Amino acid sequence: MEEFQVYLELARSRQYDFLYPLIFREYIYALAYDHGFNNSILVENLGYDNKSSLLIIKRLITRMYQQNHLIISANDSNKNPFWGCKKNLYSQLISEGFAVSVEIPFSLQLISSLEGAEIVKSYNLRSIHSIFPFFEEKFAYLTYVSDVQIPYPIHLEILVQTXXXXXXXXSCFHLLRLFLYEYWNWNSLITPKKWISTFSKSNPRLFLFLYNFYVCEYESIFLFLRNKSSYLRLTSSGVLFERINFYAKIEYFVEVFDKDFLSTLWFFKDSFIHYGRYQGKSILASKNTPFLMTKWKYYLIHLWQCHFYVWSQPGKIHINQLSEHSFDFLGYFSNVRLNPSVVRSQMLENSFLIENVMKKLDTIIPIIPLIRSLAKAKFCNVLGHPISKPVWADSADFDIIDLFLRRCRNLSHYYNGSSTKKSLYRIKHILRLSCIKTLARKHKSTVRVFLKSLGSELLEEFFTEEKEILSLIFPRASSTLQRLYRGRIWYLDIFYFHQ
């Protein structure tokens, strides 16, 4: 590990042509497979010693470059000792180390940018719940929203060129091109969408790197125009298109925007476009008319088609009013509703009522998809009626209760930001009764007899846990405690959302 740190320090002062030699370093594969330096995945699977591991990688790369090894029949795989685990073991072995190698320059860029901007590293900013206070503050004053599903890149060469434009390591990205095209040859009979799904499962680290970089490239262009939209009318298209970092090497993209986009730049003068994204889904919201949102929609479609060669139909991007439609984001249904309030005022002997209407962002738990997920996990049926969990019935009573409580705690932790708690109580009730039925099944008893023998206070933790946590935060403020428990709470320690 010390050798790896020294190598990273040397790389800070160099160009990014150091990536290709990293593929031949043993500790890269130790990092990739979470093994020690004396216990590499190459040594375990292929039976070679540490001294010859460098030679193994060289041989694998050489064989990958040979045309006759890119297409190998099933009979040949039986004769080849390298094909003992998977049919594409060549690329599988090297792609793991390659994924670690290509992450290095971008990690260095992130560290240097944080140091240069003197940004304090805060884990709270990483929480996906931190976006909801932003929605509460901004979306109450907005009128239109559009949820956009970022399409997957289909053309392999676009992925390679996009990644190569940021890191100048030609040899390394020639190898990346070989990985992708070899994998495409092995799965040429399936659809592009299915190919992406298969590739993401077989090479998750490399897929995440490529997809994140693809989204970053998309957002860099999109957010650049968003930030510059207030003075786009004053900026000539010639200066705008000279930014090679944002518009990478596709002449058709420049030609289309040079001819057709000049007449539409005027419509992008808007300082109230708000953007949020998690994984592949993004949200656009605006205060102005739907005409502006339509312009942004067609801009995104042209951006995907001309820059990434991805076809997207305009009908898949919907523009809705926040007051009439909900948008699905991060497991919540959110919309803006009117919250009327009446204030009584008295001046001397005259009193009158003042009706005040305020907009409020509502976050609602999608109860039907949640019940469907619980039914898939065998906690209830499709109607939401709790059932026992036979798989856990062989465990100890304490372990069974802990398993149910853990899932209840996670759901409660995430969905405490809901405007109403009725749906959350229903989910807790399903898990509570499922736990009781599982315990009764284990003891070969009925639910009624089991509860009668142990008392009605069993499993009260399902409903009292949040109150106990808040009582520790506000030990003396009972009114504040009750108000917070009835209201929504956003936790800043949630870093991912598993759909």
UniProtKB/Swiss-Prot annotation:
It is found in: Plastid, Chloroplast. HAMAP family: MatK (MF_01390). This is Maturase K. It holds the Pfam family Intron_maturas2. It comes from the Eukaryota. Keywords: Chloroplast, mRNA processing, Plastid, RNA-binding, tRNA processing. GO terms for cellular component: chloroplast. Belongs to the intron maturase 2 family. MatK subfamily. GO terms for biological process: mRNA processing; RNA splicing; tRNA processing. The keyword Plastid applies. The gene is matK. The keyword tRNA processing applies. Usually encoded in the trnK tRNA gene intron. Probably assists in splicing its own and other chloroplast group II introns.
